[in-house]
Amino acid sequence: MKGLLFIMEKLICFQIENTREIERLASNMKIRVIKADASMYNEMLDNIVNGKISSVNDSFSTSISPLLTDNKLPADSILIFCDLSEKHLNRMLFELKSRKVQIDLKAILTPTNRRWTLRQLHDELERERSSIFIKNKIQ
């Protein structure tokens, strides 16, 4: 069995008020749910998904992220799909939609964005949403 690498499917929930439905769906598919809080906003996604959150950020989140002390944490809820199989991703998206689970932004963890912080991912998702909105408005 040497050389086999098992990657566990995970979901990162940020700013999602009621995760009960997501947790229920994930449990049925053996997907782990990680609830990211404000102290993780400046953590790299790779660290969050692998449980390697810096103790400095846990203890001193206000000194590391001054925007959080100004109550400027984004209002958007974010769901990040980490290493889900195509089958599980499709099923999860279908179930979330059919159960009317409200999530503002969704993303898939990629080799590129896994080195980003949650803040950087949020900024990029905001840019993409604005770009789509502008394109739709022009058409």
Where would I find each of the regions flagged by the language model?
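Extended alpha-helical surfaces
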Residues: 67, 136-138
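Mid-chain, well-packed structural core segment of small domains
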Residues: 67-99
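N-terminal, charge-rich interaction modules
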Residues: 2-59
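Helix-rich interaction surfaces within compact, conserved domain-sized segments
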Residues: 10, 20-24, 28, 89-136
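A cross-kingdom feature marking solvent-exposed beta-strand/loop segments within repeated
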Residues: 33-54, 64-67, 99-113, 117-118
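Long, folded non-catalytic interaction modules
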Residues: 25, 53-66, 72-75, 85
